[in-house]
From Swiss-Prot:
Protein name per Swiss-Prot or TrEMBL: Polyribonucleotide nucleotidyltransferase
Organism: Corynebacterium diphtheriae (strain ATCC 700971 / NCTC 13129 / Biotype gravis)
SUPFAM superfamilies: Eukaryotic type KH-domain (KH-domain type I), Nucleic acid-binding proteins, Ribonuclease PH domain 2-like, Ribosomal protein S5 domain 2-like
BP-aspect Gene Ontology terms: mRNA catabolic process; RNA processing
Compartmental location: Cytoplasm
Catalytic activity: RNA(n+1) + phosphate = RNA(n) + a ribonucleoside 5'-diphosphate
Domain spans labelled S1 motif: 682-751
Length: 755
């Protein structure tokens, strides 16, 4: 394929033993970016070590190391990916008590998942040695995002390590930017944070180079392995103003635009490996079963297993297929005559699952059969309900077949925004989405407590789907926490969480810019009667996810996509097949939105238990007066009214209270200070004595405005020696304004009791 947008240069410093590959990414009018891979200087004892640079300032060290011996008893590949964020990379000291880095940030965990997903399939099947990939962020330009650079660095280090892997993986972030010079939008690679703020949509795409036959020729193409994508916060307003909407076709164009950049990154890594890689070592491989075992299982189970797979209920189907597997296992262990019964049992079970996968795939491709009897475009029965939890600010229950999600919304003051201490420029997050996946959701036991990486990833996907439709802080001055509880799982709880969140947010009274729904799709492909067939499945089950070649989750409004996640095992997907699958997902999304709209389609009244937050503006030069010395004034308003008050640097004041009356009382007191209506001579006030002196008592009339009752006025016409003989600090005193001088000083007199 063409490599016109980019080029690769290699350099070798034989004196110092350093080899480097430099890939140039050409974004046309938006300039060039340089990705540099360097090996030979740092971490030389690791099996593979590459220092990766984005331009000059962003620098990551990627290492890959394997254990000497395979892990016994493992029936999976033990790959671990860790991202170590060092705060010195941004010239900062960690904000923790001990002033050192602690548990990984959410951004680091999401970066680990971005690296793991495309890298794991490149390792040879059957490898059981532990492999650890560690990315250490050494330096980061505040304008750059390091996660996609880390994908390339991890792949390059693995290519040099001598481990049995296929070709390199290239990763690129693409941003769709529309401006006066590019009104239809242009996709650019490795956008800066400034460009991220301007973008309509972003894609993180990872892929590899594959060889394909075209007639008698063999040509190289880029096979996409992973996509993580989402619309930006301003997309709804920008589209209304005429910017291009990130529809299915626009997103597909972005995937194609990423391919040339992925190719050049893969070529740079491959060239580095040619010059500096260790010789590939021999590692013991542990295939899950032998051909003999597979043939024996297939011959014995095919007919009955095909019948069992038509049971619609997940639990009933699983019980029936598991019982049959145990029956087959008992028969074949004796028949095969293995010395190691445990190993034979494991092999028979693996072969049984492989045969089951083959049967399901063949039935899908030839008969459009699905395990639960649906057609390929059918959605499972939907259930929608809101306002389940009495004291929650908003709640919902979304059911799709056996997948059940409880959504709960909580609203609070903006000061409750999540504070972020990471290497990104973001310092806070107003919309927070948390996802919980307890073991009982699949009828199992297991660990509960702190979230696992999968839960953090699913929460981030659901959050990304909703962020574009969350109202601005000016329109809705609340911090919003959305929690998705997966109560039952059989296919895409993350997309169920998107639907439940829309319902719950509406129930809480949040004025979303548009409702959002999500759907999980699958794709099955294989050779049938000499031709390659593709079948896209709508609303996949857990089993269909495991048996398919590609799964992708699409969330969006009726007009455009807000989030997309894709993983595939195929060596490339024809563009027309992807277009058809995305169109199928769009139809399903609209069907779900129709069902949700029957229950709720506009914001409800806010819950009685939700705080009432009102925003007012005070002059910046009055902020100090509102706060008062050491916070005295603002604290007194809070104590008197029960309201919480938060003041921004621009003079915006947010007042939160349990009732509207308390909020109004606080606002009245703040306005009296910041936007005062000066009291007039003759007005009467019930004030509070705030200070006594030898010459009189100071009485607070309004917050920040006091007057003086001279000692001569306190005795009711009689002479008194001490002010404290009549009034003390804290006493309530009804007074009348006698005079206001040209400096604003107020003279008061007690109001005589007319009794």
């Amino acid at each position: 394929m063409s490599t016109k947008p980019s080029n690769v240069v290699f350099n070798i410093d034989e004196e110092f033993g350093i080899t480097e590959a430099i890939a140039t990414i050409d974004n046309g009018d938006f300039g060039k970016r340089t990705i540099r891979f360097e090996t030979g200087q740092l971490a030389r004892q690791a099996d593979g070590s590459v220092t990766t640079y984005l331009d000059d300032d962003t620098m990551l060290l990627a290492t890959t190391t394997a254990s000497n011996q395979p892990r016994e008893g493992f029936d999976f590949f033990p790959l671990t990916v860790d991202v170590e964020e060092r705060m010195y990379a941004a010239g900062r000291i960690p904000g923790s008590f001990f002033r050192r880095e602690g548990r990984p940030s959410t951004e680091a965990i999401l970066a680990c998942r971005l690296i793991d997903r495309p890298l794991r399939p490149t390792f040879v099947k059957g490898l059981r040695n532990e492999v650890q990939v560690v990315i250490t962020v050494l330096s980061v330009n505040p304008q750059d995002m390091y996660d996609v650079v880390a994908i390339n660095g991890a792949s390059a280090a693995t290519q040099l390590s001598g481990l049995p892997v296929s070709g390199p993986v290239g990763g690129v972030r693409m941003a769709l930017i529309a401006d006066d010079a590019h009104p239809k939008g242009q996709w650019i690679a490795f956008p800066t944070h400034e460009q991220h703020e301007q973008a309509l949509f972003e894609l993180v795409v990872a892929g590899r180079i594959v060889s394909k036959k075209q007639g008698k020729k063999t040509v190289d193409d880029v096979a996409i392995m992973m996509v993580e994508a989402g619309a930006t916060e301003q997309v709804v307003d920008r589209v209304k103003a005429g910017a291009p909407a990130p529809t299915e076709s626009v997103v597909a164009e972005g995937l194609e635009a990423a391919k040339p950049f992925i190719e050049v990154l893969c070529r740079a890594q491959a060239g580095l490996a040619e010059r500096a890689a260790k010789e590939t070592q021999e590692f013991p491989l542990f295939p899950p079963y032998t051909d003999v075992v597979y043939d024996a299982v297939e011959k014995k189970v095919s007919k009955k297993l095909r019948s069992l797979l038509t049971i619609k209920s997940k639990q009933d189907r699983d019980e029936a297929t598991n019982a049959y597997m145990e029956e087959i296992e008992a028969d074949l262990i004796a028949q095969l005559g293995s010395d190691d019964e445990a190993a034979a049992s494991k092999a028979i079970r693996a072969a049984y699952n492989a045969v089951m996968k083959k049967i399901v795939r063949h039935m899908i491709l030839t008969e459009h059969f699905r395990i639960d009897g649906r057609g390929v475009t059918d959605i499972r029965d939907l259930g929608v309900e809101v306002d389940l939890i009495p004291r929650a600010h908003g709640s919902s229950l979304f059911e799709r077949g056996e997948t059940q999600i409880l959504g709960v919304t909580t609203l609070d003051m903006l000061k409750m925004e999540q504070q972020i201490d990471s290497l990104t420029p973001a310092t806070s997050k107003r919309y927070i989405h948390h996802y919980n996946f307890p073991p009982y959701s699949t009828g199992e036991t297991g660990r509960v407590g702190s979230p696992k990486r999968r839960e953090i990833g699913h929460g981030a996907l659901a959050e990304r789907a909703l962020v574009p439709v969350i109202p601005s802080r000016e329109e809705f001055p609340y911090a919003i926490r959305q929690v998705s509880e997966a109560l039952g799982s059989n296919g895409s709880t993350s997309m169920g969480s998107v639907c439940a969140s829309t319902l719950s947010l509406y129930n809480a009274g949040v004025p979303l810019k548009a409702p959002v729904a999500g759907i999980a799709m699958g794709l099955v492909s294989d050779e049938v009667d000499g031709e390659t067939r593709y079948v896209a499945l709508t609303d996949i089950l857990g089993a269909e996810d495991a048996f398919g070649d590609m799964d992708f989750k699409v969330a969006g409004t009726r007009q455009f996509i807000t989030a997309l996640q894709l993983d595939t095992k195929l060596d490339g997907i024809p563009s027309e097949v992807l277009a058809q699958a995305l169109s199928q997902a769009n139809d399903a999304r609209n069907t779900i939105l129709d069902t949700m709209a029957e229950v709720i389609e506009t914001p409800d009244e806010m819950s009685d238990y939700a705080p009432r937050i009102t925003a007012i503006t005070v002059p910046v030069n009055k902020i100090g007066e509102v706060i008062g010395p050491k916070g005295k004034t603002i604290n007194s308003i809070t104590e008197e009214t029960g309201a919480n008050i938060s003041i921004e640097e621009d003079g915006t004041v947010y007042v939160s209270a349990a009732s509207g009356a308390a909020a109004e009382a606080a606002i009245e007191k703040i306005n009296a200070i910041a936007n005062p209506q000066l009291p007039k001579v003759g007005e009467r006030f019930l004030g509070t004595v705030v200070k006594t002196t030898a010459f009189g008592a100071f009485v607070s009339l309004l917050p920040g405005r006091d007057g003086l009752v001279h000692i001569s006025k306190l005795g009711g016409g009689k002479r008194i020696e001490k002010v404290e003989d009549v009034v003390n600090v804290g006493d309530k005193l009804e007074v009348e304004i006698l005079d206001i001088d040209n400096r604003g000083k107020i003279s008061l007199a007690p109001v005589k009791n007319e009794d």
